[in-house]
Curated annotation (Swiss-Prot):
Originating species: Salmonella paratyphi C (strain RKS4594)
Molecular function (Gene Ontology), one example: bis(5'-nucleosyl)-tetraphosphatase (symmetrical) activity
InterPro entries: ApaH, Calcineurin-like_PHP_ApaH, Metallo-depent_PP-like
Protein name (database record): Bis(5'-nucleosyl)-tetraphosphatase, symmetrical
E.C. no: 3.6.1.41
Pfam families: Metallophos
Family: Belongs to the Ap4A hydrolase family.
Keywords on record: Hydrolase
Signal peptide limits: none
Classification via SUPFAM superfamilies: Metallo-dependent phosphatases
Function: Hydrolyzes diadenosine 5',5'''-P1,P4-tetraphosphate to yield ADP.
Source species taxonomy: Bacteria, Pseudomonadati, Pseudomonadota, Gammaproteobacteria, Enterobacterales
Known catalytic reactions: P(1),P(4)-bis(5'-adenosyl) tetraphosphate + H2O = 2 ADP + 2 H(+)
Length: 282
């Protein structure tokens, strides 16, 4: 009965299956956690969604920015970019079923027994756990409702970039979405910087990676996240697990077995190209 945490799949279906075979994943007894961005860039987004959905209660996942962008494309709000390689998924006979399932997935996973949290980009140091849970539920409720296209149309944007309990309406939902799915750097006060994608050693002052700023959640829980492939899984404090190692860019697909903290990797079938792109506000 193992728990396997896997980083951003990005349509790399063959590598996902090979990695699960490597760790001898057994859906009847094991649990799979996925950091989001199941789709885009790799060639197998349709197969990834079909497979992950078929796992039922054996899988837990969080939504990433590319997953949200896919939903916006399907809703006719955003443009389908050839580089995302989403056309087979969008034209599939079961696309409606798959994407209605996808939009009902959470932004945040919390396991109190394991003291483990997963979010695609991480947890802003401005939030305590109760706030993070409430904020996740706010966006999840809208995504699960019939008005979800209205939200998807309004989610694009970098502002507001500073949390306040007084935020309301679409501004509040946009901040929450950015914090959970796009965040990399923060100012020392926790305010989000939505522009820098440099590696931490090259980040302009006074920016710091979100995980380098102490916050109430990171002090009490382990946090697993994806999104930031250029970290290559390195440079995070104890208890912070960066799992996106750029499989779709030619890197690796990484798995962490939670019980003994052992890592497993599956090399990408693609050539190395660690340039990163944003789906939201590309």
């Amino acid at each position: 009965m193992a728990t396997y945490l896997i980083g951003d799949v990005h349509g790399c279906y063959d590598e996902l299956i090979a990695l699960l075979q490597q760790v001898e994943f057994t859906p009847d007894t094991d649990t799979l956690w996925l950091t989001g961005d199941l789709v885009a860039r790799g060639p197998g987004s349709l197969d990834v969604l079909r497979y992950v959905k078929s796992l039922g209660n054996s899988v837990r996942l969080v939504l990433g920015n590319h997953d949200l962008h896919l939903l916006a494309v399907f809703a006719g709000i955003s443009r389908n970019k050839p580089k995302d390689r989403l056309t087979p998924l969008l034209e599939a006979p079961d696309a409606d079923e798959l994407l209605n399932w996808l939009r009902r997935q959470p932004l945040l996973l919390v396991d109190e027994e394991k003291k483990l949290i997963m979010a695609h980009a991480g947890i802003t140091p401005q939030w305590d756990l109760q706030t993070a849970k409430e904020c996740a539920r706010d966006v999840e409720a809208v995504l699960s409702s019939d008005s979800y296209p209205f939200f998807l149309d309004a989610m694009y944007g970098d502002m507001p970039n500073n949390w306040s309990p007084e935020l309301s309406g679409l501004a509040r939902l946009r901040f929450i979405t950015n914090a959970f799915t796009r965040m990399r750097y923060c100012f020392p006060n926790g305010q989000l910087d939505m522009y820098s994608k440099a590696s931490p050693e090259n980040a302009p002052a006074p920016l710091k990676p979100w995980f380098a700023i102490p916050g109430p959640v990171s002090e009490a829980y382990s946090i697993a996240f994806g999104h930031w492939a250029s970290l290559e899984g390195k440079g995070t404090p104890e208890g912070i697990y960066a799992l996106d190692t750029g499989c779709c860019w030619g890197g690796e697909l990484t798995c962490l077995r939670w019980e003994d903290k052992q890592y497993f990797v599956q090399p990408s079938n693609r050539q190395m190209d660690m340039g990163e792109g944003e789906a939201v506000n590309a």
